[in-house]
Amino acid sequence: GMKESASDFHRTPFLEELASKGIRFSNARAAAPVCAPSRYSIQFGKSPARLRLIRVGMDASHIPHAEWQSIAKVLQSVDTNYVSGHFGKWGMGASPKVLGYDVGDGATRNVDGGFVNDKSQWETTLTRDPKKVFELTDRATAFLDSCASSQRPFFLQVSHYAVHSNIQTTDSSFASMNSRPLGDRHRHVGFAGMTLDLD
């Protein structure tokens, strides 16, 4: 990875390995510093300003979800054999089906991944499948296997609920991170465990 973006505590060995063997996008930008405007921008290819959606929690009823071209709709217009899937957090004003996705979890939000908007969100909970990391990965892998066996072109978007509060991690990742010295910039053992679980 890039040294200047590395954490002084969190560990992502598999992501680092993938980055070392793949393509590095060193001049990339997110459309917005928060989730909802970025998510809309990716789906519709429009800036948050053009979408008139610049913050989390803004009303999106002015956006004609069914009429606009999404990633899935564009791919299916190029090749009708394309199958599009979405797993995990959706968080948009219309369901994935409306945007042309064939397979997915529906109109999910942070709450579907274990989010509660109160002080408890920063407490660490130990669990077997934190933020549904393993369940989402298994379903995404099954989707990929299905597309490969049917030899259909595909687009898959996986939006993990991690890393996001509420803080959830496995016993083993918590123990691993708890045995390491805390960093100066990053020090939350549970959050670091959740990051390791996602990796």
Locate predicted features.
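Formylglycine-dependent sulfatase
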Residues: 1-199
